[in-house]
Amino acid sequence: ECSVFLAKEGRGGAQQGLEIWDDYIFSCEDGGHVNIYDFKSADPKPVAGFELASSHPDNHVNNVCFGVETKRGASFPLLYITNGKVGSELEWLCFVESITRRGKRFSSEIAQTIELDGSKWVEKGYVPIFGAPSWLVDRERGFIWIFSARKRTVAKVTKHAWENQYVATKFRIPSLSEGAKVRLDENDILDQVVFPYEVWFTQAGCMHDGKIYFCFGVGKQDDNRPSCIRVYDTDRRTITARYNVQEQVIY
């Protein structure tokens, strides 16, 4: 069952990645602004806001996930920022930000930048991805997974489902002690799971204890790309749940 929990009032920017920690909802906009809402009261108006340190016209902030490590002096665990903009110089980067709260004021700094290098995956026997990696932190197990596909998931590139596959690739979560810049390549891959392609247009997702919960579609803009959720089990290596939320998406 799906129902509206909070009808947020934002600044008018395109809503993108969202995360929750304790009583705070961190709702990100394209470009890097973050609106913060009170989870307990579900007040539609933000209680605070700030700019990500990685704010940039090309930073789509497509997905955000809190990690397992907290930088000294910070108020929240590290936040992993997925760019998600195809063709951008930022496309293969994950900005790891540390957020500090002082009263009603929030601020953020880049604690680490992770670059994904997929240039030699095929040489090592792994399935390649087209780009736009979505960085998903599995806090329960302490790993980070990259979710993407062989080809772009828009209809003009993938015309038929059989042409494509979704790909989930497992890595360690780099610690801050590894430095300000870290590169993950084919030698860092711990596991890879390939899932059937049956829904178009990736949005964002999250992980919990080995399962990927991912959203797809564009709502009522296009009936051929309906809003839906899939649950991918990386242990069983299969899709374990399918949800259609087209009726609940008002746009």
Predicted regions and their residues:
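Beta-propeller blade signature
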Residues: 89-104, 157-177, 225-237
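Structural signature of eukaryotic scaffold interfaces centered on beta-propeller domains
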Residues: 10-21, 60-77, 125-145, 150-151, ...
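Loop/turn-rich, solvent-exposed surfaces of beta-rich toroidal or solenoidal domains
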Residues: 191-240
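Surface-exposed loop and turn segments in beta-propeller and other repeat-based domains
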Residues: 2-8, 47-62, 103-130, 172-199, ...
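Blade-loop segments of beta-propeller domains
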Residues: 42-85
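Short glycine/acidic-enriched loop and turn motifs that connect beta-strands
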Residues: 32-34, 84-89, 150-155, 219-223
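Beta-strand-rich domains and repeat architectures in extracellular enzymes and scaffolds
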Residues: 3-33
